[in-house]
UniProtKB/Swiss-Prot annotation:
It holds the Pfam family NDK. HAMAP family: NDP_kinase. One of its GO terms (biological process) is UTP biosynthetic process. PANTHER family: NUCLEOSIDE DIPHOSPHATE KINASE. Major role in the synthesis of nucleoside triphosphates other than ATP. The ATP gamma phosphate is transferred to the NDP beta phosphate via a ping-pong mechanism, using a phosphorylated active-site intermediate. This is Nucleoside diphosphate kinase. One of its GO terms (cellular component) is plasma membrane. It is found in: Cytoplasm; Cell membrane. Its cofactor is Mg(2+). Belongs to the NDK family. It catalyses: a 2'-deoxyribonucleoside 5'-diphosphate + ATP = a 2'-deoxyribonucleoside 5'-triphosphate + ADP; a ribonucleoside 5'-diphosphate + ATP = a ribonucleoside 5'-triphosphate + ADP. ATP binds at K13, F61, R89, T95, R106, N116. It comes from the Eukaryota.
Amino acid sequence: MAANCERTFIAIKPDGVQRGLVGEIIKRFEQKGFRLVGMKFVHASEELLKQHYIDLKDRPFYPGLVKYMNSGPIVAMVWEGLNVVKTGRVMLGETNPADSKPGTIRGDFCIQVGRNIIHGSDSVESAQKEINLWFKPAELIDFKSCAHDWIYE
């Protein structure tokens, strides 16, 4: 995969969906120049969420996190572009919204860490694992955007 074809998994959590922030979040990723290659609106099962957050299973907040993520619909997405994992994390802001800068998604729209509206893969390896967990290969659309040559050299 070429450098500008790196992929990341981004999920708008139930609070982000309920607060009507889906369009604003998608807009920010599109305006940055990233390409949406997969998206689904789902009510994730407890089993899927436990698998997604398996690395956190021994943390005291884990049961509450799974319950919160299972409390409503999620918009699961795969975005593609140059350094999309790292840049996507910068766009999201810190996990704790109180530490997030204005202009980031969490800095602009969140107050508490337990309701931080969005998840983003923290590494290329995590992104691949999360994408494979949430999407079948046929659900990811491979295409070249007309804007590609206006974004990349």
